[in-house]
Amino acid sequence: APGLRGEEARRYAAARAPFIRLGSGLSRYGNGAMNVRCITCLPAIVGAWTRPGGGLLSSTSGSQAFDPTLVTREDLQPRPTRLVNMNRLGHALGELDSPRVMALVVYAANPAAVTPDQEAVLRGLSREDLFTVVHERYLTDTARYADVLLPATTALEHDDLYCSYGQYVIQRVAPAIPPVGESWSNWDLFRRLAAEMGIEHPFFRQTSR
Protein backbone atom coordinates (compact mmCIF):
# COMPACT_ATOMS: atom_id res chain seq x y z
CA ALA A 1 0.00 0.00 0.00
CA PRO A 2 1.22 3.60 -0.64
CA GLY A 3 1.17 4.40 3.09
CA LEU A 4 3.35 1.43 3.89
CA ARG A 5 5.88 2.44 1.27
CA GLY A 6 6.01 5.95 2.70
CA GLU A 7 6.54 4.61 6.21
CA GLU A 8 9.27 2.27 5.04
CA ALA A 9 10.98 5.15 3.26
CA ARG A 10 10.93 7.23 6.43
CA ARG A 11 12.32 4.35 8.48
CA TYR A 12 15.10 3.87 5.95
CA ALA A 13 16.01 7.56 5.94
CA ALA A 14 16.02 7.75 9.74
CA ALA A 15 18.02 4.57 10.34
CA ARG A 16 21.33 4.80 12.17
CA ALA A 17 23.09 3.11 9.25
CA PRO A 18 20.85 2.91 6.16
CA PHE A 19 22.30 0.10 4.07
CA ILE A 20 21.16 -1.56 0.84
CA ARG A 21 22.43 -4.91 -0.43
CA LEU A 22 21.73 -4.80 -4.17
CA GLY A 23 21.82 -8.02 -6.17
CA SER A 24 22.22 -8.51 -9.91
CA GLY A 25 18.87 -10.02 -10.84
CA LEU A 26 16.97 -6.74 -10.74
CA SER A 27 18.98 -5.37 -13.67
CA ARG A 28 18.00 -8.22 -15.97
CA TYR A 29 14.42 -7.19 -16.55
CA GLY A 30 12.67 -4.46 -18.50
CA ASN A 31 13.72 -1.03 -17.21
CA GLY A 32 16.23 -2.83 -14.99
CA ALA A 33 19.06 -0.36 -15.56
CA MET A 34 16.93 2.59 -14.45
CA ASN A 35 15.68 0.67 -11.40
CA VAL A 36 19.25 0.00 -10.34
CA ARG A 37 20.22 3.62 -10.99
CA CYS A 38 17.38 4.92 -8.82
CA ILE A 39 18.17 2.51 -5.98
CA THR A 40 21.85 3.46 -5.97
CA CYS A 41 20.83 7.11 -5.57
CA LEU A 42 18.93 6.43 -2.33
CA PRO A 43 21.99 6.32 -0.02
CA ALA A 44 23.09 9.73 -1.31
CA ILE A 45 19.60 11.20 -0.89
CA VAL A 46 19.38 10.21 2.79
CA GLY A 47 23.06 10.86 3.58
CA ALA A 48 23.80 7.18 4.24
CA TRP A 49 27.40 7.51 3.06
CA THR A 50 28.14 9.87 5.95
CA ARG A 51 27.03 7.33 8.57
CA PRO A 52 29.28 4.47 9.71
CA GLY A 53 27.90 1.23 8.30
CA GLY A 54 25.60 2.98 5.84
CA GLY A 55 25.67 2.90 2.07
CA LEU A 56 25.17 0.29 -0.61
CA LEU A 57 26.92 -2.89 -1.70
CA SER A 58 26.40 -4.45 -5.09
CA SER A 59 28.72 -6.93 -6.77
CA THR A 60 31.96 -7.98 -5.08
CA SER A 61 33.21 -9.76 -8.19
CA GLY A 62 35.88 -7.13 -8.78
CA SER A 63 37.43 -7.80 -5.39
CA GLN A 64 38.46 -11.42 -5.91
CA ALA A 65 42.02 -12.34 -5.00
CA PHE A 66 42.54 -13.61 -8.53
CA ASP A 67 44.69 -12.08 -11.24
CA PRO A 68 42.68 -12.35 -14.51
CA THR A 69 45.76 -11.59 -16.60
CA LEU A 70 46.96 -15.12 -15.78
CA VAL A 71 44.13 -16.30 -18.04
CA THR A 72 43.71 -13.45 -20.53
CA ARG A 73 47.48 -13.20 -21.14
CA GLU A 74 47.35 -9.74 -22.67
CA ASP A 75 51.14 -9.82 -22.72
CA LEU A 76 50.94 -12.17 -25.71
CA GLN A 77 49.11 -9.60 -27.84
CA PRO A 78 51.10 -7.79 -30.52
CA ARG A 79 51.46 -4.06 -29.95
CA PRO A 80 49.74 -1.87 -30.82
CA THR A 81 46.44 -3.76 -30.77
CA ARG A 82 43.16 -2.23 -31.84
CA LEU A 83 40.50 -2.73 -29.18
CA VAL A 84 36.80 -2.81 -30.03
CA ASN A 85 34.24 -2.21 -27.29
CA MET A 86 31.73 -5.08 -27.48
CA ASN A 87 28.99 -2.72 -26.30
CA ARG A 88 29.51 -0.82 -29.57
CA LEU A 89 29.50 -3.88 -31.80
CA GLY A 90 26.93 -2.36 -34.14
CA HIS A 91 29.17 0.65 -34.72
CA ALA A 92 32.22 -1.58 -35.14
CA LEU A 93 30.60 -3.78 -37.78
CA GLY A 94 28.96 -0.95 -39.66
CA GLU A 95 31.21 2.09 -39.43
CA LEU A 96 34.66 1.14 -38.18
CA ASP A 97 37.34 1.16 -40.86
CA SER A 98 41.13 1.38 -41.27
CA PRO A 99 40.78 -1.58 -41.48
CA ARG A 100 37.17 -2.73 -41.58
CA VAL A 101 36.13 -5.60 -39.33
CA MET A 102 35.98 -8.60 -41.65
CA ALA A 103 35.85 -11.52 -39.20
CA LEU A 104 34.06 -12.08 -35.91
CA VAL A 105 34.38 -14.88 -33.35
CA VAL A 106 31.56 -15.08 -30.81
CA TYR A 107 31.80 -17.26 -27.70
CA ALA A 108 29.98 -17.20 -24.35
CA ALA A 109 27.75 -14.40 -25.64
CA ASN A 110 24.65 -13.66 -27.70
CA PRO A 111 25.21 -10.11 -29.01
CA ALA A 112 22.32 -10.24 -31.49
CA ALA A 113 19.95 -10.37 -28.52
CA VAL A 114 21.66 -8.33 -25.80
CA THR A 115 24.07 -5.78 -27.29
CA PRO A 116 22.94 -2.11 -27.41
CA ASP A 117 21.72 -0.64 -30.72
CA GLN A 118 20.32 -3.98 -31.83
CA GLU A 119 19.33 -2.79 -35.30
CA ALA A 120 22.92 -1.78 -36.07
CA VAL A 121 24.20 -5.08 -34.68
CA LEU A 122 21.84 -7.11 -36.86
CA ARG A 123 22.76 -5.06 -39.93
CA GLY A 124 26.41 -5.74 -39.22
CA LEU A 125 25.88 -9.46 -38.69
CA SER A 126 23.97 -9.58 -41.99
CA ARG A 127 26.94 -8.28 -44.01
CA GLU A 128 27.80 -10.63 -46.86
CA ASP A 129 31.51 -9.89 -46.47
CA LEU A 130 31.65 -10.58 -42.72
CA PHE A 131 32.92 -14.05 -41.77
CA THR A 132 31.32 -15.04 -38.47
CA VAL A 133 32.22 -18.00 -36.27
CA VAL A 134 29.97 -18.78 -33.30
CA HIS A 135 30.97 -21.21 -30.54
CA GLU A 136 27.72 -22.07 -28.81
CA ARG A 137 25.56 -24.71 -27.12
CA TYR A 138 22.25 -23.51 -28.52
CA LEU A 139 20.92 -22.08 -31.77
CA THR A 140 20.83 -18.53 -30.42
CA ASP A 141 19.88 -15.39 -32.33
CA THR A 142 23.58 -14.81 -33.03
CA ALA A 143 24.20 -18.42 -34.06
CA ARG A 144 21.70 -17.98 -36.89
CA TYR A 145 24.12 -15.50 -38.50
CA ALA A 146 27.13 -17.83 -38.27
CA ASP A 147 29.11 -18.92 -41.30
CA VAL A 148 30.61 -21.61 -39.06
CA LEU A 149 28.83 -22.90 -35.95
CA LEU A 150 31.01 -24.82 -33.50
CA PRO A 151 29.47 -26.85 -30.65
CA ALA A 152 30.49 -25.74 -27.16
CA THR A 153 30.57 -27.73 -23.95
CA THR A 154 28.24 -27.06 -21.05
CA ALA A 155 29.32 -26.39 -17.47
CA LEU A 156 28.96 -30.12 -16.82
CA GLU A 157 31.64 -30.97 -19.39
CA HIS A 158 34.68 -28.80 -18.67
CA ASP A 159 36.93 -27.52 -15.91
CA ASP A 160 36.31 -23.97 -14.81
CA LEU A 161 36.73 -21.37 -12.10
CA TYR A 162 33.71 -19.49 -10.78
CA CYS A 163 33.87 -16.17 -8.99
CA SER A 164 30.85 -15.12 -6.98
CA TYR A 165 28.99 -11.82 -7.42
CA GLY A 166 28.24 -11.66 -3.71
CA GLN A 167 31.16 -13.14 -1.78
CA TYR A 168 34.92 -13.56 -1.93
CA VAL A 169 35.02 -17.27 -2.76
CA ILE A 170 36.57 -18.68 -5.92
CA GLN A 171 35.32 -22.16 -6.74
CA ARG A 172 37.02 -24.72 -8.92
CA VAL A 173 34.63 -26.99 -10.78
CA ALA A 174 35.50 -30.33 -12.36
CA PRO A 175 33.51 -31.85 -15.24
CA ALA A 176 30.81 -34.36 -14.34
CA ILE A 177 30.77 -35.95 -17.80
CA PRO A 178 33.10 -35.92 -20.82
CA PRO A 179 32.35 -33.53 -23.70
CA VAL A 180 29.33 -34.64 -25.69
CA GLY A 181 29.83 -35.32 -29.38
CA GLU A 182 32.30 -32.93 -31.00
CA SER A 183 31.85 -30.10 -28.49
CA TRP A 184 34.88 -28.19 -27.22
CA SER A 185 35.41 -25.93 -24.27
CA ASN A 186 36.47 -22.31 -24.84
CA TRP A 187 39.98 -23.27 -23.81
CA ASP A 188 40.19 -26.17 -26.24
CA LEU A 189 38.86 -23.98 -29.05
CA PHE A 190 41.51 -21.30 -28.62
CA ARG A 191 44.26 -23.79 -27.88
CA ARG A 192 43.53 -25.57 -31.17
CA LEU A 193 43.22 -22.29 -33.05
CA ALA A 194 46.65 -21.30 -31.77
CA ALA A 195 48.12 -24.58 -32.98
CA GLU A 196 46.55 -24.21 -36.45
CA MET A 197 47.83 -20.64 -36.69
CA GLY A 198 51.37 -21.72 -35.86
CA ILE A 199 51.49 -20.08 -32.43
CA GLU A 200 53.93 -22.20 -30.44
CA HIS A 201 53.88 -20.41 -27.11
CA PRO A 202 53.91 -22.94 -24.21
CA PHE A 203 50.85 -21.27 -22.69
CA PHE A 204 48.69 -22.87 -25.38
CA ARG A 205 50.11 -26.33 -24.73
CA GLN A 206 48.70 -26.42 -21.22
CA THR A 207 45.67 -28.48 -20.29
CA SER A 208 42.69 -26.88 -18.57
CA ARG A 209 44.06 -28.15 -15.24
Where are the regions that the model predicts?
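Non-catalytic alpha/beta scaffold blocks inside enzyme catalytic domains
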Residues: 1-51, 59-209
